[in-house]
Regions:
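Glycine-rich, flexible N-terminal cofactor/catalytic loop recognition
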Residues: 9-69, 170
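Glycine-rich phosphate/diphosphate-binding loops that line cofactor/substrate pockets in enzymes
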Residues: 10, 36, 57-58, 84-92, ...
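Short, acidic/turn-prone active-site loops that include or flank metal/cofactor-
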Residues: 23, 48-50, 66-73, 128-130, ...
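N-terminal glycine-rich anion-binding loop in soluble enzyme alpha/beta folds
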Residues: 42-74, 262-286
Length: 286
């Protein structure tokens, strides 16, 4: 019977699910995303996926770390595409797990195109993009009736690590909130671009580092001062840059009010017995 099942499996094509894990908080993945992880036979994941999210995966699944990170891509995208096609052709159900949303600067569109061309069934499962989720965890609304009626999400990082062509004039004149992703290394150049097109040097800016984790922090300044402040604070990726009047919000920082905010606690129980305690500690901000 087992041989018959294995033969049937090898003759069918599996399916690839492009799943957004949301930001780093393990509980921000969708219910559907969690279920697919529990059912997956192969899980292909990036660095920006929080380690805790992987605990939802089956202990019998095969985990493939493709380790993409800002400024360092140890596995080329072409090879990742080949992994997805290869595993699906083995009859495996594959979860391609991505931080944030798979279609918001996550290259999910490229992977979906490869799968479609190869005749591999696929499904896209949205996730909470860091452009929205991270500001929420740091008490910043990206829209506000009196301050921002629009949101612009911009990448500040090209495939080769350089600064992309950004239409600074439309951003400087358009109003609303601007969220720059993957912009730590290009922060100074981005601010110079906005200043060069007439944005006020006093426009509030917030750099949000390691958002939705216990180690998250917010560095607040202006277009004219934030590059220096971020350098002195030694900001590192992952971080997002939020430009606009809403960046000055200070009274909604709910996360930091939790009793264990910022604390690191080591849970020494086995994985199968620690999840409930870990969830309780996370709920208190640890």
């Amino acid at each position: 019977m087992s041989l018959e099942r294995d033969t049937q499996k090898s003759c069918r094509t599996g399916k690839v699910y492009l799943v957004g894990a949301g930001p780093s908080d393990v509980e921000l993945i969708t219910v559907k995303g969690k279920r697919l992880l529990e059912e997956a036979e192969v899980i292909v994941y990036d660095r920006l996926v929080g380690n805790g999210v992987l605990m939802w995966g089956s202990k019998n699944a095969r985990y493939i770390d493709v380790g993409k990170r800002s400024g360092h891509h140890p596995i080329p995208q072409e090879e990742i595409n080949q992994i997805l096609v290869r595993e699906a052709r083995k009859g495996q159900n594959v979860v391609r797990l991505k931080g944030g949303d798979p279609l918001v600067f996550g290259r999910g569109g490229e992977e979906a195109a490869v799968l479609e061309k190869a005749g591999i069934p696929f499904e896209i499962v949205p996730g909470i993009t860091s452009a929205i989720g991270v500001p929420s965890y740091l008490g910043i609304p990206v829209t506000h009736r009196d301050l921002a009626s629009s949101v612009h999400i911009v990448t500040a990082h090209k495939k080769d690590g350089s600064l992309p062509d950004i239409h600074y004039r439309s951003l400087a004149e358009g109003g609303g909130t601007i969220v720059f992703l993957m912009g730590v290394s290009t922060l100074g150049s981005v601010m110079e671009g906005l200043l060069g097109e007439g944005m006020s040097p006093d426009m509030p800016v917030a750099v949000l580092e390691r958002g939705t984790t216990a180690a998250q922090r917010k560095i607040v300044g202006t277009v004219g001062t934030i590059a220096g402040k971020a350098a002195r604070a030694k900001v590192q990726s992952p971080a997002i840059i939020l430009v606009g009047y809403v960046a000055a919000f200070r009274h909604m920082d709910w996360y930091e009010c939790r009793p264990l905010a910022g604390r690191k606690i080591l849970v020494t129980r086995p994985r199968e017995r620690s999840s409930r305690l870990a969830a309780m500690l996370r709920e208190e901000g640890a």
